[in-house]
């Protein structure tokens, strides 16, 4: 029975998701339906948490709005609402959950960038 469920879940999983981790800055394009029209809306922020549970995987993205308020949004990784995910920059962090960023503001909330290897 569980083999059948696993096979169906594997069939519904997305294969076009890039590899990203907490601390990375990502641009998530979300499908928004307004009346009859459908468009993609960009949500850019830092990944503060990632939950890997197969088809039920999710990740939390936090961005600072124009008035200084933090906005967090949880996205289901394999949801059809998520149009695409683009990694803008990779961050260096030593924790899996970056909930401490909620209390930090300004320059204290910055994350170091992971630079590429020199050849």
Curated annotation (Swiss-Prot):
Disulfide bonds: none annotated. One of its GO terms (cellular component) is cytosolic large ribosomal subunit. GO terms for biological process: translation. Keywords: Ribonucleoprotein, Ribosomal protein. GO terms for molecular function: structural constituent of ribosome. InterPro entries: Ribosomal_bL19 (IPR001857), Ribosomal_bL19_CS (IPR018257), Ribosomal_bL19_sf (IPR038657), Translation_prot_SH3-like_sf (IPR008991). This protein is located at the 30S-50S ribosomal subunit interface and may play a role in the structure and function of the aminoacyl-tRNA binding site. Belongs to the bacterial ribosomal protein bL19 family. This is Large ribosomal subunit protein bL19. It comes from Psychromonas ingrahamii (strain DSM 17664 / CCUG 51855 / 37). The gene is rplS.
